[in-house]
Amino acid sequence: MVEWTDKERSIISDIFSHLDYEDIGPKALSRCLIVYPWTQRHFSGFGNLYNAESIIGNANVAAHGIKVLHGLDRGLKNMDNIEATYADLSTLHSEKLHVDPDNFKLLADCITIVLAAKMGQAFTAEIQGAFQKFLAVVVSALGKQYH
């Protein structure tokens, strides 16, 4: 079980209360698909993903990026039981979708990068530490079914 300080809980809650899902989600998933092109294989039904421009302009990518960020809300609401919160999603991604669990970490890194770019200097080391801890716990929970 992960121990959360009151400060970490406050930081994570504050990030999500100000998060522009419609901006950060599409940018983060687009970045992941562009920087790590092998991740595109899981999105073959999304249409044209042949280059950066087509990925950035793809409505399916944007919608899924938003969905992913809203999926993080579940973890935020259940910070003391993140593993159980994502158990069904872990099973789906491992048994049906066959997503490489390393891809969760890649996407988490892209979310962090996009959020940092958006927040600028306000994205302090303390904020980054709490946010990345939260994402690491979610990534671990999503990968549980693979072990």
Swiss-Prot record:
Q: Which InterPro entries match?
A: Globin, Globin-like_sf, Globin/Proto, Hemoglobin_b, Hemoglobin_oxygen_transport
Keyword Kinase part of the UniProt annotation: no
Q: Which domain of life is it from?
A: Eukaryota
Tissue-by-tissue expression: Red blood cells.
User: What residues does heme b bind to?
Assistant: H64, H93
Name all Globin domain ranges.
3-147
Q: Which keywords does the record carry?
A: Heme, Iron, Metal-binding, Oxygen transport, Transport
Q: Name one GO molecular function term.
A: haptoglobin binding
Q: Name one GO biological process term.
A: hydrogen peroxide catabolic process
Question: Which Gene Ontology cellular-component terms appear in the entry?
Answer: blood microparticle; haptoglobin-hemoglobin complex; hemoglobin complex
| Known role | Involved in oxygen transport from gills to the various peripheral tissues.
What family is it from?
Belongs to the globin family.
Which PANTHER family does the record cross-reference, listed alphabetically? HEMOGLOBIN FAMILY MEMBER, HEMOGLOBIN SUBUNIT EPSILON
Q: How does it assemble?
A: Heterotetramer of two alpha chains and two beta chains.
Q: Please, what other remarks does the record include?
A: This fish has five hemoglobins: Hb C, Hb O, Hb 1, Hb 2 and Hb 3. Hb 0 presents the strongest Bohr effect while Hb 1 presents the weakest Bohr effect.
- Name this protein carries in UniProt: Hemoglobin subunit beta-1
Q: What gene is it encoded by?
A: hbb1
